[in-house]
Amino acid sequence: MEEKINEGLTTIFREVFSEPKLTITNEMSSKDVDKWDSLAHLIMLKEVEAHFQITFKIREMAGIQNVGDLITIIESKLNDNQ
């Protein structure tokens, strides 16, 4: 499942941050991507919700510090939906 999540996130991140060659890692955070500001963060989260057909709670969104945190939340939500 993590591979499918990584593929989806890579596509979303490349589109939202306008970086077609961007490679994501679990440790990647807003400090690593020039265009990752607060507005881009919200846009990215909405794209993730739409792509994976999930909904984030405010506290979940506030707790995301890096891509690894995001993957963990997505996995949890997808497992809950099965």
Summary of predicted features, one role per range:
Residues 2-36, 40-46, 50-82:
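Phosphopantetheine-dependent thiolation modules in NRPS/PKS and related acyl-activating systems
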